[in-house]
């Protein structure tokens, strides 16, 4: 919590000089056990070779075994630093065109890559040349370790597989106030954000696309980006990118890349993330919002089908690194493309902010993607990374170093997940009885594709399951099935003590086998932290606690009729009652032993409503630090628009210095910096601040430990 931070305290009394904290950090590198020298071998020579190898091999590589993905960094700088003057790196000048030189560097790196691959009998996954020169290999760990003796090799590190980190926010954080500034609102205009994720559904209305399912279906058949004149996307919003993975890629098999980075229908993570950062917004009529953002009051925002992203005028690149499921080893390749998205050797189209809502738990400090993040920071690009969501501790993220890499990269702006004052909830519409007709809050089952269902499929009469099988965990008898046929079944979700007798899929399958059209579940929570899966063949809705009693009574009476629909998903905005609480699953980062702590700040990430892939105009709610990071990416774009000569150091400092809203748990206890960073983000204050304080010895980390 920020009130204990030396640098924040100084901000409050108006210091205008950079604070030199003189922090010294040291990292211990484990050494191999001593071995007996070979007969006749010069021991001094052998000692020198061991020392060289230990400098080149990362700590994790020293112990690695078997066939693994590895990044081999070659000596020297990447093409960007080799060809661009210092003023460009400091964001004081536009990049110079050095295409011929960049192409020569690329050719040299590709030649080196083939050489090391042949020497180690490994397969080339990809090469990098813009950020730093190197190659990703898949091969035997020992054979790749032997490359450490090559004079052109600087560092060898295992690649750690990365996973996806699964409208009120713009009001809570002051982002909407920045849209309404006099003369010029700060909406991210002129700033390019690269989203490294599962792709973007650029046909969605939130990004200016046609907003139809037919347009999405047409776009998914292409292996190249459609022409700008095709009408399938808005070139003012979406600038293109690459699919580095292919639908079937899962991190273990071979990627099948192409030039069309559209999201997968069974994915949607990247689409949601992109909308949170820079979606135009979708109005109540399902049209792309093309109006004046400065006129959007909280009331008008609440009426929109999808609220704008935090930087609605920013432009987007998509670098797809995930298939439709599974992990990825391709993040380093995507980071290399951030500096030259179209690959022509001209860096004038580079992104200034890169969002990564991905990572891995407890990954080592020597992850090569973290090196790339640090290098990009030096080259003028800020990486905004989700802190991560705990998966191995019953959803509780209060475990040191849980967040892993690249969230623990020193220069990254690492974002924890806080609760906003309001959140979006799905709605169902009660059609009968008339005395309780209207919308009720809850959440839709996840595995069913509502966008392709007919209106008739998503409505019907609801009857209660028999008391003897009220949880639906057992198969329904023939007698019960006769009562459920062609109706929806109301099932109790949990026991009175909150325990759950079986999972949702079992219940949905039992209901389907009995001939039911859909499932309605009760709930003992107003907003559940975790969703319900259901199954792929019948729809389902879990009713919030506040509406469960009346739904139960009318279902038992046989008078309840209900409707679901894409137009109702995310259709309610309710008060959370938990403003500025930290979400319990938000992962804790490093504790300071390495000379710094993580995360850096927090942003709203609970029940965030954003664009849903393949729906045209629909929305979906996700919770996690994956949703917090893109909101912060949009704020970074606002700050850079307001201060166009800011370097990543200054952007990060402005955002951390101004994030002075304390976060607390459900009991009101305030969190310390090693769980939430400096505090909850404040977009308006980040733009307004003129006093930037950061660690003079290590400015990339901003704060002291």
Predicted regions and their residues:
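Secretory targeting and sorting signals
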Residues: 1-33
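Autoinhibitory propeptides
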Residues: 2, 21, 33-37, 111-192, ...
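Hydrolase catalytic cores
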Residues: 274-277, 321-322, 496-498, 504-534, ...
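Short acidic, glycine-rich surface-loop motifs adjacent to enzyme active sites
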Residues: 338-365, 386-387, 486-496
């Amino acid at each position: 919590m920020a009130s204990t931070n030396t640098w924040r305290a100084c901000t409050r009394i108006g210091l205008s000089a950079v604070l030199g904290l003189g922090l010294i950090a040291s990292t211990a590198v484990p050494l191999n056990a001593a071995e007996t020298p070979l007969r006749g071998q010069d021991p001094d020579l052998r000692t020198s070779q061991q020392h060289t190898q230990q400098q080149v091999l990362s700590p994790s590589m020293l112990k690695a075994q078997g066939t693994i993905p590895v990044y081999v960094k070659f000596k020297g700088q990447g093409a960007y630093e080799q060809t661009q003057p210092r003023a460009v790196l400091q964001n004081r000048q536009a990049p110079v065109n050095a295409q011929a030189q960049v192409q020569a560097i690329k050719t040299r790196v590709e030649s080196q890559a083939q050489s090391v691959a042949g020497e180690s009998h490994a397969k080339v996954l990809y090469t990098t040349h813009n950020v730093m020169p190197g190659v990703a290999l898949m091969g035997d760990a020992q054979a790749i370790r032997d490359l450490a003796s090559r004079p052109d090799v600087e560092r060898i590190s295992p690649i750690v597989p990365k996973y996806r980190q699964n409208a009120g926010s713009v009001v809570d954080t002051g982002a909407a106030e920045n849209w309404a500034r006099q003369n010029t609102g700060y909406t991210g205009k002129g700033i390019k954000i690269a989203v490294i994720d599962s792709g973007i559904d650029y046909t969605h209305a939130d990004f200016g696309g046609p907003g139809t399912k037919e347009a999405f279906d047409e776009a998914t058949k292409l292996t190249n980006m459609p022409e700008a004149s095709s009408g399938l996307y808005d070139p003012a919003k979406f600038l293109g990118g690459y699919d580095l993975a292919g639908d079937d890629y899962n991190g273990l098999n071979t990627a099948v890349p192409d030039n069309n980075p559209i999201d997968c229908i069974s994915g949607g993570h990247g689409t949601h993330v992109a909308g949170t950062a820079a979606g135009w917004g979708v109005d109540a009529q399902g049209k792309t919002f093309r109006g004046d953002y400065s006129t959007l009051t909280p009331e008008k925002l609440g009426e929109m089908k999808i609220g704008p992203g935090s930087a609605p005028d920013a432009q987007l690149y998509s670098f797809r690194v995930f298939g439709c499921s599974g992990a990825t080893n391709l993040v380093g390749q995507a980071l290399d493309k951030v500096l030259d998205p179209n690959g022509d050797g001209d860096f004038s189209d580079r992104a200034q902010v890169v969002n990564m809502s991905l990572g891995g738990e407890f990954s080592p400090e020597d992850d090569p993607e973290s090196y790339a993040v640090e290098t990009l920071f030096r080259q003028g690009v800020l990486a905004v990374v989700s802190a991560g969501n705990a998966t191995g501790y019953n959803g509780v993220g209060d475990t040191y170093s849980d967040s892993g890499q690249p969230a623990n990269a020193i220069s990254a702006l690492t974002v924890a997940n806080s609760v906003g004052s309001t959140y979006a909830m799905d709605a169902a519409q009660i059609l009968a009885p008339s005395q309780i007709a209207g919308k009720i809050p809850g959440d839709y089952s996840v595995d069913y594709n509502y966008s392709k269902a007919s209106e008739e499929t998503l409505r019907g009469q609801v009857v209660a399951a028999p008391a003897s099988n009220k949880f639906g965990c057992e198969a329904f008898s023939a007698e019960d099935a006769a009562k459920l046929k062609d109706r929806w079944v109301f099932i109790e979700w949990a026991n009175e003590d909150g325990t759950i007798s079986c999972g949702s899929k079992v219940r949905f399958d039992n209901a389907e086998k009995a001939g039911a059209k859909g499932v309605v579940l009760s709930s003992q929570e107003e907003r559940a932290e975790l969703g319900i899966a259901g199954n792929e063949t019948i729809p389902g809705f879990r009713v919030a606690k506040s509406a469960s009693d009346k739904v139960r009574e009318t279902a038992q009476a046989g008078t309840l009729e209900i409707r679901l629909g894409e137009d109702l998903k995310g259709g309610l905005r309710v008060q959370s009652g938990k403003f500025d609480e930290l979400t319990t699953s938000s992962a804790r980062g490093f504790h300071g032993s390495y000379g710094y702590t993580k995360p850096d700040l927090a942003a709203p990430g609970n029940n965030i409503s954003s664009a849903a892939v393949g729906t045209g105009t629909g929305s979906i709610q996700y919770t996690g630090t994956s949703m917090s990071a893109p909101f912060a990416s949009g704020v970074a774009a606002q700050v850079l628009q307001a201060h166009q000569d800011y370097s990543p150091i200054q952007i990060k400092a402005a955002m951390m210095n101004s994030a002075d809203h304390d976060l607390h748990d459900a009991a009101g206890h305030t969190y310390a910096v090693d769980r939430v960073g400096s505090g909850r983000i404040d977009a308006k204050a980040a733009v307004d601040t003129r006093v930037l304080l950061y660690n003079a010895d290590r400015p990339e980390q901003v704060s002291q430990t």
